[in-house]
Swiss-Prot record:
Keywords: Membrane, Viral envelope protein, Virion. Belongs to the baculoviridae E66 family. Component of the polyhedra envelope. It comes from the Viruses. The keyword ATP-binding does not apply. GO terms for cellular component: membrane; viral envelope; virion membrane. This is Occlusion-derived virus envelope protein E66. InterPro entries: Baculo_ODV-E66_core, Chondroitin_lyas, Lyase_8_alpha_N, ODV-E66_C_baculovirus.
Length: 631
């Protein structure tokens, strides 16, 4: 089709250029400051196998986008550099000439395999769009770009014969819309298209009870049942464009803000179970998306608890039968322990370390492979979700603390355990109780307490209280319980890291009696910690007390009670509660745990959204299921 220059095209291109530097900061997948040398051997850049390696092809595309951003930056030495402009222009033609015309169906171009579709359906259209716009006053790439988008993005949800949804469609739709602008359509005409409407309905981000999108507790899901924030983070840079094209209310930015607040930090750190299938716990762009304020944040239905304060960031994920505890793909299958068992805090003043996807991290239980490598491959040609065979989780939060209690069985990891985590002002206490291997083991198990990067820090020589980037690990024994083993240090020379671990006997693991616990504390206040953990005799009750007893967490699973003396708050939850709107808390279930705290049911002061009958309390809340009282 002949390219028609209509006003909406010019208006969008101006907006794109005016905001490119800001939106590029928000882009997660990128080459931030492109410096790679152009080549004259037909591969675009030196030392690149552009036409035979999917990895190299992706790097080339991101480098071209990065160079386009530098070309647009008035403060960059390459601003409107003519040699660079010609290199970008030539690169677009080289790519186009190497591609099959029309696009292949259910296969990838250049002899690459289907899992490499992402480069051709998402990154390549973005690259052509970006280069076409930044060079518009130097070289005319409009017809070339329109033609490529015609073949590789015939619809915002269809590329190379494959339909895409959710996060992928959010990315694909923007260059598709640009292609329509090149063809002379207006913003309004494009917005009326059926498949564009599908994407716009997605990015309205209405709260949903299940499936893709932002749930009522503000957790983001993709692939139906996966807490896959990588898709939301990767798509965020497109939201301002959609609001410009189709109106400022197109994307519900408040719901997006609440969703990101649930999981992120200003340092860019995220629990690895929430971000990416490569096991990463870091996204450099997070600080460019929103300001992450301090507080205790909980996603009660999606089982996410996050704490940010002036000392640390902490985040833990729990499990539920309808939520994937792990998702694998053909290229990523070693991160199940990271997703399922990471229990730690990160110092606000510590260095951000390059992350290793090996399963060695605070909270991970090592059973069959003590080196942390457990391969749980996908069961099909694409991604596969894995669910717990049993899972009950309850969250409880006050102004100063947050707790999570869970019972879970993970068949692929050969584990069943109870997990109790408490965040407080100084750090985190964690206990695994009733740990059981589903299949017999002969070697002792280990729980990773702390990991030390030996690239930048001296190696540990003892295993008492251990410090690694500004975090102190503290050993605890449980009152009325057999003493627990001291920490043991291991060094992994090939990985250049050390671990502090607690050993659990194989005999205990095989019969379901495994126990391990520890605290991770901000280094500067570790000496202030006075956390205790007590088993109440002749019962299943556990009491965790900390901060000079001002924070007390009592667990009589499935019930968890969190008491905050400073704020006079008391929060109660039941892990067996599966309701999503009207929640019931049986009085019989909480009488004993309240008595441990020298309280009774009559001590509880009810807020407006909680009512009481003879046998139960009732809470009306679409966004959470915690019963929050004063006393």
């Amino acid at each position: 089709m002949t390219v028609i220059d209509k006003n909406d095209l010019a208006v969008f291109e101006k907006y794109y250029l005016d905001t490119l530097q800001t939106t590029f900061l928000q882009k997660a997948e990128k080459v931030a400051h492109a410096t790679r040398q152009f080549s004259d051997d037909g591969n675009i850049f030196v030392n690149m196998n552009t036409w035979s390696s999917a990895v190299d092809f992706g790097i080339v595309l991101h480098t071209l986008i990065g160079y386009g951003v530098r070309f647009n930056n008035r403060n960059d030495e390459l601003y409107e550099n003519e040699e660079l402009a010609y290199g970008l222009y030539e690169a677009m033609h080289l790519i186009y000439e190497h591609l099959p015309d029309p696009a292949p169906t259910h296969s990838a171009p250049l002899g690459l395999i289907v899992p490499d579709w992402y480069h051709f359906s998402i990154t390549m259209p973005e690259c052509f769009q970006n280069t076409c716009i930044v060079l518009r006053d130097h070289y005319d790439l409009r017809e070339l770009t329109e033609s490529l988008l015609h073949y590789y993005l015939p619809l915002p949800t269809l590329s190379m014969g494959l339909w895409r949804t959710a996060g992928n469609a959010m990315r694909m739709c923007l260059p598709y819309c640009y292609g329509q602008l090149l063809r002379g359509y207006t913003f309004a005409e494009i917005g009326d298209e059926t498949q564009v409407q599908y994407v716009l309905d997605l990015i309205k981000f209405p709260l949903v009870k299940s499936g893709n999108g932002i749930h009522y507790d503000y957790a983001y899901f993709d692939h139906t049942d996966v807490r896959a924030y990588g898709y939301l983070v990767n798509s965020y840079f497109t939201f301002s464009y959609y609001n410009f094209l189709f109106g400022e209310e197109t994307v519900n930015m408040q719901n997006v803000y609440n969703s990101l607040s649930l999981i992120g930090s200003n340092q860019g750190i995220v629990n690895p179970g929430l971000l990416s299938r490569n096991g990463s716990n870091y996204s450099a762009v997070l600080a460019h998306l929103i300001e992450f304020v301090d507080g205790v944040f909980s996603g009660d239905f999606s089982k996410i608890l996050t704490v940010r304060n002036n000392r640390y960031f902490g985040s833990v994920v729990g499990q539920s039968p309808d939520i994937a505890y792990y998702e694998a793909d053909p290229n990523n299958s070693l991160h199940a322990p990271l997703w399922a068992m990471t229990r730690r805090i990160w110092s606000n003043t510590g260095r951000v370390l390059s992350y290793r996807s090996v399963g060695l991290e605070s909270g991970i239980l090592l059973t069959t492979n003590l080196n942390g490598v457990i391969n749980v491959p996908t069961t099909g040609p694409s991604t596969s979700s894995f669910h717990p065979t049993l899972a009950y989780t309850a969250l409880a939060a006050t102004e100063n603390a947050g707790g999570m209690a869970m019972h879970v069985r993970l068949a692929e990891l050969n584990l069943e355990f109870h997990s109790y985590t408490l965040y407080h002002r100084y750090g985190m206490f964690h206990l695994y109780d009733k740990i059981r291997t589903l299949r017999h083991i002969t070697n002792n198990a280990r729980c990773v307490v702390l990991v030390r990067d030996n690239n930048n820090e001296s190696r540990w020589t003892s295993a008492s209280n251990l410090i690694s980037p500004r975090i102190t690990a503290k050993h605890h024994n449980i009152i009325n319980n057999s003493s627990l083993s001291n920490f043991d240090v291991r060094t992994f020379d090939a990985l250049n890291l050390s671990t502090a671990e607690q050993i659990i006997s194989a005999e205990l693991m095989n019969r379901g009696g495994g126990v391990t616990c520890f605290s991770l504390l901000a280094q500067d206040v570790a000496g202030n910690d006075n956390t205790t953990i007590t088993r109440i005799p002749e019962s299943n009750i556990l009491v965790i007390a900390t901060n000079s007893n001002s924070i007390q967490c009592v667990i009589d699973f499935p019930v968890v009670v969190l008491k905050d003396e400073e704020t006079r708050q008391i929060t109660i939850n039941d892990a067996t509660n599966i309701s999503r709107n009207l929640h019931q808390l049986s009085i019989d279930k909480i009488v004993n745990v309240l008595s441990v705290l020298s309280l009774s049911v009559d001590s509880l002061i009810l807020p407006a959204n909680i009512t009481r009958s003879a046998n139960s309390f009732y809470l009306q809340n679409d966004h959470g299921n915690q019963f929050k009282f004063m006393y």
